[in-house]
Amino acid sequence: MTRKKKKTIKTRKKMKMKRKEKTRKYRGESYPYKNITRTEAVADFVNLKNQTSLNPRSVIGNNAVNYGTEKIRVHTKYRGKSLMQRWKDPVARKKLKKFAMNLYKGSYATGNLFHAFQSAIALQWATLSSMRPAAALHFYRKYEATHVLDFTAGWGSRMVAAMAGDIDYIGIDSNKSLRPGY
């Protein structure tokens, strides 16, 4: 076997292993966090930093933000209940599981139950969104910002964008539980 052939076989095996890790089996018992790794978050941040022309609608940088704030975000109340409170409610979870299974088996199925649960939560309960770091960085670059004072720092998207653009950033937020995520 040639050296090049061995290398491609090894590469294929690595890719297959990565794919297996991404499409892990999910049974629907624990809350379906995205579980972004530190490596993925750093890679996403570096990708954002290296972009020269950004589309404000791009999702580049979202993993860097979600890495620090996703576990706190699910405890934020929307219409009186947080996503975690809804998840712990057996009646609400049963309805969600049924909806997720319909998504999983339906015509728009991705073949991944984990993603079906995430989609079901977003469609049935709510999504707690934040500004896209790519959009913030686009505006910072467009208006040649050198300093940013953010009175509603929120989930940290604008902070991540400022870091990616090497811009001085001061963020103020009344929610002290967000500090570890920053």
Annotate each language-model stretch with its function.
Residues 136-182:
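Conserved S-adenosyl-L-methionine
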Residues 113-138, 152-161:
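A short mid-domain helix/strand-loop element embedded in enzyme catalytic domains
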Residues 2, 55-57, 67, 145-146, ...:
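Generic hydrophobic/packing signal
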Residues 1, 18-129:
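N-terminal accessory regions of S-adenosyl-L-methionine
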Residues 3-21:
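Long, low-complexity Q/N-rich tracts
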